[in-house]
Amino acid sequence: MYPPALTLLLTPGLVAAAIQPQAYASSADGRYKLSSYSAPVRGTGTPGSNSTWKLTIDDTPSGRKQTIKGFGAAVTDSTVSVFNALPSAQRTALLNTLMTTAGANFAMMRHTIASSDLSANPAYSYDDSNGQTDLSLSNFNLGGRGNAMASLLAEMRRLQPGLTILGSPWSPPGWMKLNRAIQGTTVNNNLDHAYASQFAQYFVKYLQAYQAKGATIDAITIQNEPLNSRAQMPTMYIYADEAGDLIQNNIGPALRNAGLDTKIWAYDHNTDQPSYPSTVLSRAGGYVPAVAWHCYASSLDWSVLTTFHNAHPGVEQYMTECWTSAKQPTPWNWAASFTMGPLQNWASGVTAWVLGTDTNDGPHLTGSDACDKCTGLVTVDAAAGTYNLRGDYYMMAQFSKFMKKGAVVMSGTGSWTYGDGSGLESVAATNADDGSRVVVIENKFGNEIYVTVEAKSGEVWSGLVYRNSVVTWVLPAAGA
């Protein structure tokens, strides 16, 4: 069966000045790590004895899809602590590698509002108030860990001025909940609506505190994984209609009245419950411009995002969490796949879980529910004063380094995965600044594939794609 064609659009009028075709690769065998690779050539080239694969790109206005906002990962307390444990020179080098064009050029970060499972003990919020009710939130305080988080995010924003920061809480202060606990029980693990106003003001105070430290937050979700209730980590259950009403009646107005333009994204959970964000939009659509998805559905299907887009074409979508692990190894292309799939289905950005951990996948809370196998894109050996960029980092950088913020994803066909997991997946975009066209190709075969890309404008590009690798082609503007 011959795979369908990939389509791509170039925005008219953009001129790519002296852009030469380039290619970069990251491979399963570690031979390539965001490394320069044989560039594609004009024409059909010479495939020799290599297997071939044909893609087509439609570089006309009909192919325009979503605009890229950025790629990155979750900044947790673990990330902050291990990055800050590095010697100054190493820390500076790492942040430049992550946040600038010298490295991954990450332009989106999701951070944890107070404690998550990837926090050292004890779990905390920004207004614990010794467990006592604090109606005026007079005891609100970022504390040492919150201040350290805000400082790191501010530093990231200075390095990447176009950075989009999303904040997500794992739990509000325990006194706001029916069970009066951040963690420890799943009984009555819900918001006490007697404190709905304080819940909304908690977000206001958090946003103002971070803004004062130079870490302006662009968007929030009101609860990480609102359908996940666990005893041994911070969680809180929020029903879909409840979430919509809280946003419409409390949180949205509170942010507006405080003069904050922070956006509220719906859901922040798995793709198997698309009715949840639909319900939120029906009840609070005026405050909700975007939906956030996670990758943990038992039967993961990113086409859910396309179906959702067709029902809600004006709503942005993001893939905001998918774990990476070394202790429970995921496939070599795991991070590439959880970036590729959402992009093919209308996602404007992707963030992995998690940006940084130590070499033991922590620090993390104790208890069976906390993730003790979540490994950062970066691991830090504090004793040695060194860091390691893991394979998942390179897989995500194959997208983030070349598909710049503002790039437009193009409609396409041509991607195909067989039942045994082999195949070739691709997504393409046009950069807004120079008109360069970026085609990311994920080769899931154990052999090299000679790929030919035919453009509707008349161009043909071809080149070899390394086995079990992700290769990014950077092509000049059409007609250049």
Swiss-Prot record:
Residues 1-17 form the signal peptide. Keywords: Glycoprotein, Glycosidase, Hydrolase, Secreted, Signal. It is found in: Secreted. Gene3D superfamilies: Glycosidases, Golgi alpha-mannosidase II. Its EC number is 3.2.1.75. One of its GO terms (biological process) is glucosylceramide catabolic process. One of its GO terms (cellular component) is extracellular region. One of its GO terms (molecular function) is glucosylceramidase activity. The active site is at E225 (proton donor), E321 (nucleophile). Partially degrades N.crassa cell wall beta-D-glucan, liberating small amounts of oligosaccharides. This is Endo-1,6-beta-D-glucanase. It comes from Neurospora crassa (strain ATCC 24698 / 74-OR23-1A / CBS 708.71 / DSM 1257 / FGSC 987).
